[in-house]
């Protein structure tokens, strides 16, 4: 096969390290990369790069299966999931597996099955990765032209993009089918404190679905993270799955337009940078979603959101003091504002005290107590149910910020020794990973653009400070 360009021409990164270590001819001299540069050595070896990708997928799936079984083995049914440091079982419970009313786990067998299936899948992927890395053809273009490619082949690249989009679309529809036909999903808003239910009345109105994208990300608007019902979530997956599938078909059947051919850099490193940029956006979006949204990420499994824990504290003390005879409608706090209840900027009745900054919170344990003008004083006096009291007391003491009390918003009693909320773990990890993916995007985009412009020189090692230092040995 004729290679369209020399990897050493485009990627002449020099290193101080010993370049003699090689594997199957993939050494620094022939590839332009030292052994520790990993998959960069395989840029023009499509068969070996396939092996690396399949093996990587196997590692990911192996972790999922092993961690899944680890959590099942340590699961205690008497305690809520968020108190046990679980990060995978909450996802399975949200999908409706093994849970019943109120989010109580009735059966852990589906979780065990999930773990075993992932382990078996990882073994298949692992064998495939080893085969393609060590035994299979180095390049696919000669033996399997459908799977072969060159990075500069714009039409082939958009065809591969199309195939990926179709697979993503099918993934979105898997959730739709689970919600509609295979047992439903856990709905935290189901009457009486949440339950598993099949979704029957999808929201397919494009004005509603795409209206989320046009919302402000600030305050009570909340962009797409403000979705508060499963009908909109599943309807959104129908739209997204359809767009991905039709977009994939479009990219397979068409060739890139002239403007696209001119606008993009067409090289392996450029595609890597585009992918990292997309993953960074996904990570930042997931961070906001898991931190603020208690519909897609039910508080029964992930623990309360920050605003939810704060409002739960106000509600818990309101219930206590009302039983002791306090008049919650007129009592004043030390600032002269309402101690238990006050008015929001838009005139609604909200909880008083410091939690007023979270006045636009919506939570299933609190919504039944609202009326047309915010919290209903009559309902607060007569209609509070025991399950609402229990849940708010539980959420009050399990804030994702790791704090029960605070002064002016500064935490004073950090409780992060015996309890860290899975919501905190997931939000923080996705933000940090999203940030590093974004930095990787900038790094590889800069290298790809420089290589395309012809001035990528690598790092100048002649003036490297380490050269003037005494050798370690």
From Swiss-Prot:
Residues 1-14 form a propeptide. The modification N-acetylthreonine is found at residue 15. Its main location: plastid. It is a multi-pass membrane protein. One of its GO terms (molecular function) is electron transporter, transferring electrons within the cyclic electron transport pathway of photosynthesis activity. [CaMn4O5] cluster binds at residue 367. The chain crosses the membrane at residues 69-93, 134-155, 178-200, 255-275, 291-312, 447-471. InterPro entries: PS_antenna-like, PS_II_antenna-like_sf, PSII_PsbC, PSII_PsbC_sf. Gene3D superfamilies: photosystem ii from thermosynechococcus elongatus. Binds multiple chlorophylls and provides some of the ligands for the Ca-4Mn-5O cluster of the oxygen-evolving complex. It may also provide a ligand for a Cl- that is required for oxygen evolution. PSII binds additional chlorophylls, carotenoids and specific lipids. The keyword Protease does not apply. Keywords: Acetylation, Chlorophyll, Chloroplast, Chromophore, Manganese, Membrane, Metal-binding, Phosphoprotein, Photosynthesis, Photosystem II, Plastid, Thylakoid, Transmembrane, Transmembrane helix. One of its GO terms (cellular component) is chloroplast thylakoid membrane. GO terms for biological process: photosynthetic electron transport in photosystem II. The modification Phosphothreonine is found at residue 15. The keyword Thylakoid applies. It is found in: Plastid, Chloroplast thylakoid membrane. PSII is composed of 1 copy each of membrane proteins PsbA, PsbB, PsbC, PsbD, PsbE, PsbF, PsbH, PsbI, PsbJ, PsbK, PsbL, PsbM, PsbT, PsbX, PsbY, PsbZ, Psb30/Ycf12, at least 3 peripheral proteins of the oxygen-evolving complex and a large number of cofactors. It forms dimeric complexes. One of the components of the core complex of photosystem II (PSII). It binds chlorophyll and helps catalyze the primary light-induced photochemical processes of PSII. PSII is a light-driven water:plastoquinone oxidoreductase, using light energy to abstract electrons from H(2)O, generating O(2) and a proton gradient subsequently used for ATP formation. Belongs to the PsbB/PsbC family. PsbC subfamily. This is Photosystem II CP43 reaction center protein. It comes from Adiantum capillus-veneris (Maidenhair fern).
